[in-house]
Amino acid sequence: MWGRKRPNSSGETRGILSGNRGVDYGSGRGQSGPFEGRWRKLPKMPEAVGTDPSTSRKMAELEEVTLDGKPLQALRVTDLKAALEQRGLAKSGQKSALVKRLKGALMLENLQKHSTPHAAFQPNSQIGEEMSQNSFIKQYLEKQQELLRQRLEREAREAAELEEASAESEDEMTHPEGVASLLPPDFQSSLNRPELELSTHSPRKSSSFSEEKGESDDEKPRKGERRSSRVRQAKSKLPEYSQTAEEEEDQETPSRNLRVRADRNLKIEEEEEEEEEEEDDDDEEEEEVDEAQKSREAEAPTLKQFEDEEGEERTRAKPEKVVDEKPLNIRSQEKGELEKGGRVTRSQEEARRSHLARQQQEKETQIVSLPQEENEVKSSQSLEEKSQSPSPPPLPEDLEKAPVVLQPEQIVSEEETPPPLLTKEASSPPTHIQLQEEMEPVEGPAPPVLIQLSPPNTDAGAREPLASPHPAQLLRSLSPLSGTTDTKAESPAGRVSDESVLPLAQKSSLPECSTQKGVESEREKSAPLPLTVEEFAPAKGITEEPMKKQSLEQKEGRRASHALFPEHSGKQSADSSSSRSSSPSSSSSPSRSPSPDSVASRPQSSPGSKQRDGAQARVHANPHERPKMGSRSTSESRSRSRSRSRSASSSSRKSLSPGVSRDSNTSYTETKDPSCGQEAAAPSGPQLQVLEPKEKAPTFSASVRGRHLSHPEPEQQHVIQRLQPEQGSPKKCEAEEAEPPAATQPQTSETQISHLLESERTHHTVEEKEEVTMDTSENRPENEVPEPPLPVADQVSNDERPEGGAEEEEKKESSMPKSFKRKISVVSATKGVQAGNSDTEGGQPGRKRRWGASTAATQKKPSISITTESLKSLIPDIKPLAGQEAVVDLHADDSRISEDETERNGDDGTHDKGLKICRTVTQVVPAEGQENGQREEEEEKEPEAELPAPPQVSVEVALPPPVEHEVKKVTLGDTLTRRSISQQKSGVSITIDDPVRTAQVPSPPRGKISNIVHISNLVRPFTLGQLKELLGRTGTLVEEAFWIDKIKSHCFVTYSTVEEAVATRTALHGVKWPQSNPKFLCADYAEQDELDYHRGLLVDRPSETKAEEQGAPRPLHPPPPPPVQPPPHPRAEQREQERAVREQWAEREREMERRERTRSEREWDRDKVREGPRSRSRSRDRRRKERAKSKEKKSEKKEKAQEEPPAKLLDDLFRKTKAAPCIYWLPLTESQIVQKEAEQAERAKEREKRRKEREEEEQKEREKEAERERNRQLEREKRREHSRERERDRERERDRGDRERERERDRDRGRERDRRDTKRHSRSRSRSTPVRDRGGRR
């Protein structure tokens, strides 16, 4: 399913985990050296174990362990038991089991002794080369394989019997594996190291061993499946024998146990029944068997077994893995680890088990040293994991690892917290129950893994069949996941934790009828789960992202686990694979919502969610844990399923809050296709990986929520709700983390009952809606908003989320403007107090719809006052009554705007703690006609209302009264109800926040009562349509006499009667509207004169209104009043009045004409259609203002005229220039004249002196220049003379040269002449020589 390499039974290619130990697992030849790739293809391993040097090496390593210098085989059983007792290990079992158990413990002790704080130091790095050459080990391994085959067959039968009883224990075993991961890093590292050492020393051994076993194991699980019915019966008859056989088999092969677990997965349900019977008897045996298995698994056979089991389980897992996908998340992690180091993991598991036994003893004594060891282990593990991670296995494994990465993160947190738990384990190692309990504490500190493990444990009823049957698969899935995890460190941590959990799980479950231990561990884990609830509040912060990822994983896990859960029944009825595939698909949808999904999701869910899930599972399982084993297993399985569903829901919610809408879509799809449950489960691994990133996205997975909600168990739902508030806002989660987890728990417990019931209903409805929403949200373009479904999810999330969560949601909405998911978050302002509490969980605010998308646009929506009570009454069927939900449907653009407004006004609603803001949704005017401002205001109001309006839906938890905002009605009654007033014109629904009154009784009015109301202190955002709707509630407005200033800061409203005006003032005075308004509206009566003045019909402002306005707070920016004029002269006053009257009449006539001209437009304008009325109204306001300004200017001119007389005084005082900007000047006095003249004379003298000096300087300069010129002339003459002289010399030289040349020529000529003469002479001589002589010379 995960795309891992599937080794052939012959082990052709096996990816082996190589730790940082520097051991090369490549060919099993013990090359020591760093492993460059995490995975390596190993050559075909010989099937004969004896021929495998790695196996022999591993065996030799195991064999070399001595006690007091004596080989363990030489010790008597009593000595072995005494040694085991010293180490707090189980003493039951055959000698071989005791030897192996003791060996594991001793190896662990040695590891701890030799382990250094440096992760780089790998104690096993030197062992590799020596071990593979030991022929004895090869023979031993061959024998072991034979024994393993026999015992595997035996175990398959026994396991089939035990599976039924131990189905739960199987899951617990899976959880113990998780517990191992929960174990402190020391344990894990020690476990990992032994396993790694074993694997490093016996890579081949493990591979060949696993190959041989692979065949037998693969066959045996299948045989076990076929024999499951027979084996179940035989197991019920042979519990003790099966335990001993399991011990032997465990000694031989932990992988056998894994296979047995796989077989058990098929037989889990039967085993669960038997498990109940055998749990008590098997506890001790399980402990012993576990220890034996630890030691056995510490041996190479375990590695091979793991590999073989990997192969078998892979073959099985193909059907099962779909079912077990959630377990597969664990298993895939384990398998990833197993496949990479399948052998290593098995050996590691064995070694870990033995080491865990030793560690438990040592940790009892060395609890103090645990932190150091943990640090060392962590460092070594991180190094190992890093080295392993460098060469990730195939992408499928990476996909698996991606979920594992989440788990590693959880594991990291677990490892961080585990030491105390380890201490607990160390203190009570002897009993597996104690160990399990300790594991549970470990789970608590490391809630992520715990929840992965313990929720599986709690869900073991559902998951055990699968998980226990495939411990190897779980290990593999865990190991590949963790191994391949993108964060290598995380994956190592995941591996370590998973592997350590596996050893623990195997200790607790494999050796003994894993059923008993599984059941016990389930009980114990479920018991500690409450602790994890507390713990996971802190863990949330650590693992919020992992939680998100894991929540996705959980979703997938749920699907897978749903499939798995059905698988258990299916396995019982048919072959594991066939039944798994069929039953998961058939029951995947039902069972998914219960335990399996939650189980799988829990492992995948982020640590926080896991913790919550675990806590939930524990909370629910604790009551069940107490009952007898039978009831325990049943109740545990139930509680597990509940906790799973809770954890799934919580994790899904967590993921939802970040933006798991995609995830939820995926999960929803998966839920939709129960038949595809297995397939979906198988793909879920990759999907998880994909989803994990998505989870981070701010979308909410409604379907996930729906699933969680759909889980019928009230407790689960309540827990889910609790978790949901926590998850709702990571901030809240962090805050909760910061808060003591205990605080969350009490609240959770208090609200559990009430919320569980309500939340169940809510969750069911929400689940359906959310699923729809998920699909729609994914499929729709971002512009489209799945309107109703998202609202439901939002309601759920809002209710669940604290206030911060709601705000975050709205922020998310605003951040995701493309998908216009307008969520009118009807989350009460008490959310802030409730953050992290489950108080708000039940509450589900009404859905938000996009603007204009209301189902009945023209219908009047019945007014719903959304109060806690009304929401409670609604919750049973949250389905929105047609149009009754206080839902605002936005057009796409509106929704965008409203989202922006939500961002702007997101926090406005909560400023008044004492107020509850009710919002009235009205449908107004055709969408087309609205002004932009109006639309914005509507939308802004909508978000505003959304933020504060959200009353808690089903939060029955008694919240501190101050937290709940009082709903004050601003209309005549003080109970503000949410009213939907639809104006038939419409298409656009306008949401109006009902005014919020702070003072019960409005103060007495200042002005005389009249039918005109002046409302000031208006603060945007709001639209004229919204304002008029608000004003129209208490009376009929006279449209023509309505005036509002340009910036909408104050308005004059004229009502048809004085009574309506009085009602309006009573309703609106001292009220906050819109909700974001920081000021309180001031409503008072006004006179017609003031209205006329503001409308521009009156030039002078009435004196009363002036006084009134001076006394009353004016709007932010009222139109600037004309400058105060000094009292004009009576004549001017008279003239002014006449002019004002004339202008008034002219203005009124113009107004009448204009009205007639634009009657239709004005009507549109009045209705605020969007076409252009806004600009029209603006231009009208502008015209009015200009008119007012022009009047002001005229009055100013008059004022100037009146002020001129004092200006003439200036003329009297000063003399004035005639130029336009007249300059005033004064003549000088006599003294000044004398002084000035003296100064002038002085200046003249100064100037003269300066002039003379300047002339002298110039003269000197001229003389110097002339001198310089003369010198220059002389220089020039000299140069000329020089050049002439030089020319003459040159001439002379030339003549001399010519003469010389002539002489030379003559000499040459004479020489030539001589040469010619000599030639001629010699020629004549040679001619005269006799021929004889010439011949003789020849």
From Swiss-Prot:
UniProt cross-link Glycyl lysine isopeptide (Lys-Gly) (interchain with G-Cter in SUMO1), position: K267
Residues carrying N6-acetyllysine: K861
Region (Disordered): 1-57, 155-866, 892-950, 1104-1214, 1226-1338
Biased composition (Pro residues): 1115-1129
Region of interest (Sufficient for interaction with RNPS1 and SAP18 and formation of the ASAP complex), residue spans: 1209-1236
Compositional bias annotation for Acidic residues: 161-171, 269-290, 936-945
Post-translational modification (record): Undergoes proteolytic cleavage; the processed form is active, contrary to the uncleaved form. Phosphorylation on Ser-1179 by SRPK2 up-regulates its stimulatory effect on cyclin A1.
Crosslink position(s): Glycyl lysine isopeptide (Lys-Gly) (interchain with G-Cter in SUMO2): K318, K378, K732, K861, K879, K969, K1046, K1106
Residues annotated as site: Cleavage: Y1093, H1094
Basic and acidic residues composition-biased segments: 219-228, 313-353, 542-559, 757-767, 798-815, 892-915, 1130-1174, 1193-1214, 1236-1317
PROSITE patterns documented for this protein: SAP
Protein name (database record): Apoptotic chromatin condensation inducer in the nucleus
